[in-house]
Amino acid sequence: MAASRSSSRISFAKIIEPLEVPDLLALQTQSFDWLIGSDAWAERVQEAIDSGRDDVPITSGLEEVFEEISPIEDFSGSMSLSFRDHRFEPPKYSVEECKDKDMTFSAPLFVTAEFTNNTTGEIKSQTVFMGDFPLMTPKGTFVINGTERVVVSQLVRSPGVYFERSLDKASDKDLYSCKVIPSRGAWLEFEIDKRDTVGVRIDRKRRQSVTVLLKALGWDEARILERFGDFPSMRITLEKDHTASQDDALLDIYRKLRPGEPPTRESAQTLLENLFFNPKRYDLAKVGRYKVNKKLTLEIAHDVGVLTEDDIVRTIEYVVKLHAGADPAEYEVDDIDHFGNRRLRTVGELIQNQVRLGLARMERVVRERMTTQDVEAITPQTLINIRPVVASIKEFFGTSQLSQFMDQTNPLAGLTHKRRLSALGPGGLSRERAGFEVRDVHPSHYGRMCPIETPEGPNIGLIGSLSTFARVNPFGFVETPYRKVVNGRVTDQIDYLTADEEDRHVKAQANTPLSPDGTFAEDRVLVRRKGGEVEFIPPDEVDYMDVSPRQMVSVATAMIPFLEHDDANRALMGSNMQRQSVPLLRSEAPLVGTGMEARAAKDAGDVVVCVQAGVVEDLSADYITVMHDDGTRRTYRLAKFRRSNQGTCINQKPIVFEGDRVEAGQVIADGPCTDNGEMALGKNLLVAFMPWEGHNYEDAIILSQRLVQDDVLSSIHIEEHEVDARDTKLGPEEITRDIPNVAEEVLADLDERGIIRIGAEVSPGDVLVGKVTPKGETELTPEERLLRAIFGEKAREVRDTSLKVPHGESGKVIGVRVFSREDGDELPPGVNELVRVYVAQKRKITDGDKLAGRHGNKGVIAKILPQEDMPFLEDGTPVDIVLNPHGVPRRMNIGQILETHLGWVAKTGWQVDAGTEDWKERLRGIGADSSTPGTNVATPVFDGAREEEITGLLDSTLPNRDGVQLIGSSGKATLFDGRTGEPYPYPVAVGYIYILKLLHLVDDKIHARSTGPYSMITQQPLGGKAQFGGQRFGEMEVWALEAYGAAYALQELLTIKSDDVVGRVKVYEAIVKGENIPEPGIPESFKVLIKEMQSLCLNVEVLSSDGVQIEMRDTDEDVFRAAEELGIDLSRREPSSVEEV
């Protein structure tokens, strides 16, 4: 059992980090705690108040929304309704029950509603039910209709004021513009054109002079000149402005905004008021007010969400000063891609916006009911309709682009999914419109968003991952920690800085050498300034220092050893492929790790963690009972062979024994892809880098048969099959063993209900659940009527609609769930019974499967060789895997070579002899000068084992059982050909590398079809494995046959094998009767083309070679006659789409 092995790693890290890795799920859990105002949030608020910090919002999300909407007044203001004190009842079902029964894990939300009659002063108070509110599980996910989902955080442009510079190509002048962007409401834009006039656009409408807006706000010409007279641009603008008074200006604005409507002073004044000065219509939000105050150096209170006259005047002043060439240190344009100008909408805020939307819809209903109902009879309950609120929350979780089906391939995939940052989604960017600048790596991403981990393809750069140490502040800006440096001495004080604050400081990197007293060891320190510029400066000018070398990368990237030796493109692939790794039968932690494995596994939430210290009292495969020190007991239930969202296997197993002492926070059971509490995504395999008979050309891989025999790379996959019995127009469907026209042996594994027994081996086409559906009643013959009279209903027509194992799938039945209306289960309307069957299959590794390392070195297995044919070492050990060395140099992922060498060192163990070389001193200093064989090592990113250390350790490895050191400082060994026993002419790089088996398995991709469904319109076979489609013989394939002159093969492919409906049946008939295959007819798609042209009023006729018109009939009697003889039902409509299949 794995528990016997220690999971401690020998680390090659030289830097002592002052800060622990924070809770990796805090991005999700803290945001949701704030939304619902949970106890955990209240504790954080209290702690922040006690220590004088303001980094925790003191009003919960739901409270904010209810405060915003209260009071709802009727149109006359005589009555109002307000909400306060929301609370949650305990959830009705547990997370596990919700997953089992396809329900949403939620808790009932209650709010105290107060109805006030303002004329009489009477107050009626009631507790109102506001619907079931989905709750977050402790793992940061939501269970919606039985499936786990994740809400991804969204990266959006922050509300605020932004200044831009652009070059006018004609006049070669710098033009300046500015946008005031609110959280909700109309945009206000200022711009200076090439004629030096200052213009304004209100709500994206036509441009007008900025002086018109100032006059509309009540300024006269004298006041404008007094404030802006020094700027030529404003004087020119004023000269060209023909409005004389405030009234003229207001009417002028009204005409531009509402062309065609008769303007009056009152309506114009109201319009302007509503656009920018009405809190109901315009809101900068707290973050917008913070950004505006900061940019324009104002001191307006944070709760003022509307624009003030001061805001507008200062913005105009800023633009004209920029245009006049003011001091760049004080006045500068903004970079929209800077992380000071992009903020995160986390889960809490996204759901809060949705609740706000629902309450706004409800508000309209309440107002209408206030006017229609009798004042005396009104109670809060009669006014409120919770439908819009419930619907908007449901809509968000069910259909929003940001609520996603959780990636559960392995624990790392889930963890990364929860830490994902997306610029897409409502209110964000779209793939098509996003340019290169938005997608690019920006200096302000440092320590906030990982520069490596992002998808390949159309979403590159739009979807990122939160860096390891980053956190989100109350405004939604991402902060990263730095160590404070005072007078050239590094302190233990940690400050979290936003990208804006960071720009004002000078930062040293984490690996800057320090003296024991915390001062810089060298007299010149390499630092980073604003915009990513680097230079050497004296130590006393440094403000901050990085807390850790892995501060800039995400969790997945921080799990790549020797990341510093890999090209970024390959590291990106490595980060992404770790998330596609399949949980294997027996997990094995990497020999060469980075020290991040244990933390990632624990925070991913797929292991069982002990809550309170105590002693293990009782345990089995299903549960662990711990007796706590205070005498209480707690039983931890383990998940056994559950199906994940991706069909991989979730299985937990204990790693402690009865009587063991366990501490709070200790891992007591491993989950999928974990080994002794560490993330274990693959296997350590003995690798040789050499070409082998051309079989590993172009990234192909050669494997040893041992990996198949010993189930080294075998994984379990579980498929769920579902069938329901519904009420149809002709009567109810029935789940039964009594299926018409089916042999008894087919039903051998079904029980008396018609459901397959657990443990049965099934293959494609086997019946899992027997089901019959009533057939349409036809006119009965007298004989049939007689039979009915004698035998009663028994002779009624039913057809077999049983659930069968799909093509290409097989395995063993491991579970059956039956839900029926009779037993009181909640089922959709019209469904009487629902049966789910779980089929598990063990997939051994096979040729065609995709394997990968952690450095983006991926390939497909081309050949599995018998163990005796594999190249072997001097002591007879055959290698497990042969990789092509050509895959390394041009891809520049040298990390895999260093991992190979260090893997060998870790596997064989080492003993460094006495000596004064630098590397020996360093290893002694960190306690890494000796180890036993099979010791796991950690080489953290940017702070790992150095090249000379690895060279030295290869020389210091322990000898094998024959006293021979197989590999020296070169890292290469003499290998022998397994087939001939001859040594290969050159030494070969051999060592241990961590190999992952990816979810791209050949069994899921391989597919073949004889006959199957055809498309309704073109009558051609459908495409794709899911539709049981055919292989497309495309344009280029046709050219190939044309080039060879294979005319008959081509004609056959384009007609009878595809869409010549008549010919298809005739060929079938000819084959059955043993006759020659007839001449092909006209393909259906040709007929469709003719019809389309005719629909465009083009008279198209088809003529034969001798000029006679060819008649194209839609049906052919001969076909139907032939089909009937052969028992083919041509009247049955083939499915025309994926849904129907």
Curated annotation (Swiss-Prot):
GO terms for cellular component: DNA-directed RNA polymerase complex. GO terms for molecular function: DNA binding; DNA-directed RNA polymerase activity; ribonucleoside binding. Signal peptide: none annotated. It comes from the Bacteria. Pfam families: RNA_pol_Rpb2_1, RNA_pol_Rpb2_2, RNA_pol_Rpb2_3, RNA_pol_Rpb2_45, RNA_pol_Rpb2_6, RNA_pol_Rpb2_7. One of its GO terms (biological process) is DNA-templated transcription. It catalyses: RNA(n) + a ribonucleoside 5'-triphosphate = RNA(n+1) + diphosphate. Keywords: DNA-directed RNA polymerase, Nucleotidyltransferase, Transcription, Transferase. InterPro entries: DNA-dir_RNA_pol_bsu_ext_1_sf, DNA-dir_RNA_pol_bsu_external_1, DNA-dir_RNA_pol_su2, DNA-dir_RNAP_su2_dom, DNA-dir_RNAP_su2_hyb_sf, RNA_pol_bsu_bac, RNA_pol_bsu_CS, RNA_pol_bsu_protrusion. CDD domains: RNA_pol_B_RPB2. Its EC number is 2.7.7.6. DNA-dependent RNA polymerase catalyzes the transcription of DNA into RNA using the four ribonucleoside triphosphates as substrates. The RNAP catalytic core consists of 2 alpha, 1 beta, 1 beta' and 1 omega subunit. When a sigma factor is associated with the core the holoenzyme is formed, which can initiate transcription. Belongs to the RNA polymerase beta chain family. This is DNA-directed RNA polymerase subunit beta. It comes from Frankia alni (strain DSM 45986 / CECT 9034 / ACN14a). The gene is rpoB.
